[in-house]
Amino acid sequence: YGQEDATLKVGDKNENLDKGFNRIGIRRGRMKFEYNDGIGTGAVQIEVNDKGVSFRDLYIGIKDPWTKRSQLMAGVFNRPFGYEVCYSTSSLESPERATIIQYFFPDERDFGAMLTLRTKTTSPLSFLRLDAGLFAGNSINRETDSRKDFIGRLGAEKAIGDWGKWGAGFSYYHGFVYNPTTEAYEMRGNHFVKRDMGETGTYMKRQYLGLDGQFSFLSSLGKTTLRAEGLIGTQPGIAGSSKSPNYSTRPENLPENSLFKRPFLGYFFYLVQDIGASPFSAVLKYDVYDPNTKVSGNEVGAENSFTSKTDLAQSTIGIGGIYNFNKHIRLQAYYEFNFNEKSNLVKGYENDRKDNVLTVRLQYKF
């Protein structure tokens, strides 16, 4: 169910903009085939939902024959950035990943090759893991240019006795976005300035830094899990969207496809509390995404600033509950309080939009 201004993940958009609406649908339906003979690995994953049929994973890998903990992979697989990108969808405590993850890492996966390095289990550094690779940069679509993006993460994970566990990671993304026009826009103060690129087919750099941390422990209340992640950097997008490329053909040389380079900030927190030994879990999530940290409030939409609703920040408070019938079946109810930055100069965003969402989901995993 969504309020009148909401966007839901299943079904069509609202047919009556003055009223709330509801939709029923298949959000995810996946089947994964995996192979592992100790040295060679491979996987194919297919997704079926109310939008059609597509593939999710398609990769092969070769492990080192000595420790079998380091690996070289090639194909389509999760991008090694942060913690939530690679977190299993079937284990998510909220219906969707954080806003900035959905915007910057559509489908979570990309075409590429990645090297994973880990020491043997008896080493004092066995809790460390380094992932680094080169990727096409436009999700699971076919590659459209000759530039490759670098993505890497150094992570650590370690148990604390038999009662707790911690983890942390630092991630880096260095890539480029294709600009099909002769113009591009960059921030100067609180407004965009137009740059003449001199030719079509140039590129603008996108660069992200990420930090993530996880901590879980057991107590008389049950298992408590805390997770946090933050990203900062620059993201080229178009006037109408700050999302990462997610297309299978290069955009055309049209004014609306000119790139805007935005400095961004995004972060999110999870608190998941199992209720003792019962099958219930309570979930609290806070999610913030500011696509342009150089402007705020009524600076957005100002005359000759070239800013728009795309530059407004958004945040979400999510509250939910999970009931695990068994290890295969779980029921999830989750309510999202969505908030947007307001500007008197952006039509439709003078006040907070009515776009809260209630999701009730039944999941079966086998």
Where are these regions (language model features)?
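Outer membrane beta-barrel
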Residues: 1-139, 144-151, 155-162, 172, ...
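Outer-membrane beta-barrel pore domains
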Residues: 17, 62, 164-174, 180-366
